[in-house]
From Swiss-Prot:
Belongs to the MscL family. The lineage of its organism: Bacteria, Pseudomonadati, Pseudomonadota, Gammaproteobacteria, Pasteurellales. The chain crosses the membrane at residues 10-30, 70-90. One of its GO terms (molecular function) is mechanosensitive monoatomic ion channel activity. This is Large-conductance mechanosensitive channel. Signal peptide: none annotated.
Amino acid sequence: MSILKEFREFAVKGNVVDMAVGVIIGGAFGKIVSSLVSDVVMPPIGWLIGGVDFKDLAIEIAPAKEGAEAVMLKYGAFIQNVFLLGVIAIAADGMGTLINKIKKPAEAAPAEPTAEEKLLTEIRDLLKK
């Protein structure tokens, strides 16, 4: 079997197409969540703690020299990315829970015992006496 034929069979199964769609949607979702955190969530938090823009929070480790910028420890961007991770984790957990609820089949009612099972139960009950 040729490599091309094997790949075609693998791709046609649907898993590759589903995965590609998931990656594309995930990339777009990541941009939306990033914008939500940086443009909607962080500004009010910064305002509440004194008008701070988290993107600008940094500590200068080494001053600027000729031809080189200052070395900065940008902890504000890190805090913002931690919030971003939290929002993505909550959204992914919510979507996973929703998908599992949709996929989970309704529990079937217990099946009625067969005639053989009923007979065996009666025999067991008689032997107990």
